[in-house]
Structure formats: structure tokens, C-alpha cells
Amino acid sequence: YLEDLKEIFAQIYTVTKDDGTLWIVIDTFKRDHAVVTLPFDLVQKLNSVGWKLQEIIIWKKDKTVPWSSKGFMQRKFEYVLFFSKQNNYKTNKDQVRIYDTQQLKKWWVKYPERYNPKGKALDEIWEFPIPVQGSWGTEYIRHFCPLPKEMVATMISISTDEEDVVFDPFAGSGAV
């Protein structure tokens, strides 16, 4: 599986613009009563073909099914890995800053050295509710955990400009 993903993302690397980025939503899982650290194993594979890991974001989900087969713990988050092709990559961080005057005032008073008039930078923990299966429309594949439209829009806003090309190698089946 990892070798297949490595090959896919190596091919994507060759057609990505120099300032391009890559977003992957991925999770750990259990096999033979042990956690498989798939996100971190994948990072190593992608580094070997040139991708540079820039951020690890936690998508805190509002609901899920039990993580283990016995229901010991619920997995309430997934990893969102943000890669770039080169060190100088496109980012529109000012477009996604949080500008809520009530939140901003509290934040600014507590951390005045971090004040930015354009708003507060995004946190590394994102909270987006999971859409109901089929909420993207009847023509879409029913995915076990569809990505929230708002989360996808945030990713696109961060890393693209109007008229840029966004490529989803898995055709909306669960990967961005």
C-alpha cells in the first residue's frame, strides 16, 4: 500500500508546479492488536521522492465509530498532512486568518507580541463537523467519512489562487 502511494505521489510531484502543495488526510489504524503509524510511514516515503512536510494538522471530528474492534477508544481525529514541492511554496495564510473581534481582542490582550491586524493565524487543530453520508449529492460515492466541504475549501484557500488547477488523484473518493 505504501509503495503504491509513494509511486502515485511521485508521479504527482513531477507534474506539480514548483510552488505547489499537497494535502493528505490520513489516519492510523490497528493491525494484529498494534497501532500502525501510517501517516508517519507515508511521510518518510513522500520525503524520499521530494515532497517536504510543512505542517501536521489535527482534524478533530465531532463523531466517529469505535477505533478498536472492541470499542475501547473512539478515534476522534485524523491527520492532515501538508506538503510542499519546494521551500518557497504558495500559501495564502492571510486569507484564512480568524478575524472575530471578540476572539481577537481576548487573544491580543493575552499575547500582544503576536498581534496581527489581519487576524489570528489558524490553529493546528481544525474542528469541522463530519457531513452526513450522501450530503455531497447522490452522484458521489458514499464514503465512510466524507470530508467537510468547509475543510476542503480551507485547504484550497490556503494553497491556491483563483484560476489555479487543483488535482485530486483519487477523484473525490476520500483524498484531497
How should these model regions be labeled?
Residues Y1-V176:
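Core catalytic lobe of class I
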